[in-house]
Swiss-Prot record:
Lineage: Bacteria, Bacillati, Actinomycetota, Actinomycetes, Mycobacteriales
Gene: murB
FAD-binding PCMH-type domain span: 29-203
Family statement drawn from the similarity comment of this UniProt entry: Belongs to the MurB family.
Pathway: Cell wall biogenesis; peptidoglycan biosynthesis
Catalysed reaction, written as an equation: UDP-N-acetyl-alpha-D-muramate + NADP(+) = UDP-N-acetyl-3-O-(1-carboxyvinyl)-alpha-D-glucosamine + NADPH + H(+)
UniProt superkingdom: Bacteria
Stretch forming the signal peptide: none
Designated name of the protein: UDP-N-acetylenolpyruvoylglucosamine reductase
Organism: Mycobacterium ulcerans (strain Agy99)
Keyword field: Cell cycle, Cell division, Cell shape, Cell wall biogenesis/degradation, Cytoplasm, FAD, Flavoprotein, NADP, Oxidoreductase, Peptidoglycan synthesis
Length: 366
């Protein structure tokens, strides 16, 4: 089917029919949406979703998927009659050390805006693809920092009532790569993020540096604070080496980033693993136990960079970073799920640890 623009039907939003979703996601897989509604303002997001949710409750609308950057989602190939609401509101407001970013804002643009204003706290999260609205959903984190460290509140649309309100961070149940906002299947989200507020450091210093690879790159000690722009540059260099900065010409970046989260296990499981391998197992303290490095587990279980090594395979592990499942061109969501299951099951068979996916899976499952 060819894409057909049909004009504006909902709250002034842009509407098109028969739109391939693959080009709108960083993994570049997905079905053709029956309807794509692009919302450029918060009022449009609210108006469109209220209308569509009313229709769905009356049985007059098929499944509705809400997304923005498409960087942390795998959408099943066979989803039919799908209506997609693309959140594209992108205003950023700075008031002293408080920064409010609308949900559709490109995340890295938020980071840049804060650094340009001399605010620290987000520099370690540079280069992460996707939108500002996705960051609280999975409590985005990298290089020793999580967004929950600086989020004060989130503006939400409650889809059951249509109400819009600011919800304090304390009510969002933030955890490792999760929040109360992620506790639902992708087509049944009870609330949609409209805007996020951050409280940042106006002293001109970065967040405390805790990640060994980053402190080494900067020649600093753990716990020290750096100049935010210098920290950003170091983070981008590290991410680029791992294929974690989007580049249309580099298939290693055609991914959702790390596909599996680092597992948190009981101390005795870590001790068993260390005894089993006879190696120094990378690990970090976690509130509920010991956090292991999923990439290390993959490689020790036989799933090294570039697995399965077949140059004709449409989906392979990145040649730069084993945790990234990449589309080498022409892959489908089914191809991604096959490789993900192979890796998950292989790690479980070797180590007795079941890895969990980091992206939101819509219309597909491991």
């Amino acid at each position: 089917m060819k894409r057909r623009d049909v004009g504006s039907l909902f709250a002034g939003a842009r509407v098109a029919e028969s739109v391939p979703l693959a080009p709108l996601t960083t993994l570049r897989v997905g079905p053709v949406a029956r309807t794509l509604v692009t919302c450029d303002t918060t009022d449009q997001v609210v108006g469109v979703l209220r209308e569509l949710d009313d229709r769905a409750r009356n049985g007059d609308c098929g499944p509705v998927l809400v997304f923005a950057g498409g960087s942390n989602v795998v959408i099943g190939d066979a989803l039919a009659d799908l209506t997609v609401v693309r959140v594209a509101n992108d205003r950023v407001t700075v008031d002293g050390n408080l920064v409010r970013a609308e949900a559709g804002t490109v995340w890295d643009e938020v980071v840049v805006a804060t650094i340009e204003r001399g605010l620290g706290g987000l520099e370690c999260l540079s280069g992460i693809p996707g939108s500002a609205g996705a960051t609280p959903v999975q409590n985005v984190g990298a290089y020793g920092v999580e967004v929950s460290d600086v989020i004060t509140r989130v503006r939400l649309l409650d889809r059951s009532t249509g109400d819009v309100s600011w919800v304090p961070a304390a009510d969002l149940s933030f955890g490792y790569r999760t929040s109360v906002l992620k506790q639902a299947e992708g087509l049944a989200l009870p609330a949609v993020v409209l805007e996020v507020e951050f409280a940042l450091d106006a002293s001109g210093r970065s967040a405390p540096l805790r990640y060994g690879e980053l402190t080494a790159a900067l020649g600093m000690n753990s716990g020290e604070r750096g100049e935010p722009r210098a920290v950003r540059d170091a983070v981008l260099a590290l991410r680029t080496r791992k294929g974690m900065v989007l580049d249309a010409a580099d298939h290693d970046t055609w991914s959702v980033g790390s596909f599996f989260t680092n597992p948190v296990v009981a101390p005795e499981i870590y001790e068993r693993l260390a005894a089993q391998t006879g190696e120094s197992v990378p690990h970090y303290p976690a509130p509920d136990g010991v956090k292991l490095a999923a990439g290390w587990l993959l490689e020790r279980a036989g799933f090294g960079k570039g697995y399965p090594g077949d140059p004709h395979a449409r989906c392979r592990l990145s040649s730069k970073h084993a945790l990234a499942l990449t589309n080498r061109g022409g892959a489908t969501a089914a191809d991604v799920m096959v490789l993900a299951r192979t890796v998950r099951d292989g790690v479980r068979d070797v180590f007795g640890i079941t890895l969990k996916p980091e992206p939101v899976l819509v219309g597909c499952a491991l």
